[in-house]
Amino acid sequence: TTRLGEVSRTRAPGVLIEFAYHDNPEDATWIKQHISEIAENVVLSLTEYFDIPFVSPQPPRRGIVTVRWGYLNIREKPSLDARVLAHAYNGNSIIVNGQWENWYVVNFNGVVGYADSRYIHISQ
């Protein structure tokens, strides 16, 4: 493209990173050849900054909540001390997008967070 847009005065957290000059042919070629490494480095840096684990993308899997008490907490981070974002009840369907240690990265009714993997049965 011959036009570059720049977002300023955002109302949400944002990161503006300049890796090279996209209008320089050598830089543009370098970016194209290294885009995966650049993306992975940015993600690792941001997850470290925000103190959340980097979870490699995995195909989404459908799971069922299996608790014998009130509900399963969907948390902001993979920690029992993390803020609770939502409650999933026994038998609720949940989408599992990845795993970090004994925590699943889940999407429950549009809420993305972490849930203890011991209480989710993955459907085959």
Locate each region found by the language model:
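A short macromolecule-binding patch
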Residues: 109-120
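Short alpha-helix capping/helix-loop boundary micro-motifs
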Residues: 78-83
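Extracytoplasmic
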Residues: 12, 69, 101-103, 115
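Active-site-adjacent mobile loop/cap segments within catalytic or ligand-binding domains
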Residues: 1-57
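Anionic group-transfer/hydrolysis microenvironments
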Residues: 20, 75, 118
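SH3/SH3-like beta-barrel fold
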Residues: 91, 104-108
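SH3-family beta-barrel domains
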Residues: 55-73, 86-90, 98-100, 121-124
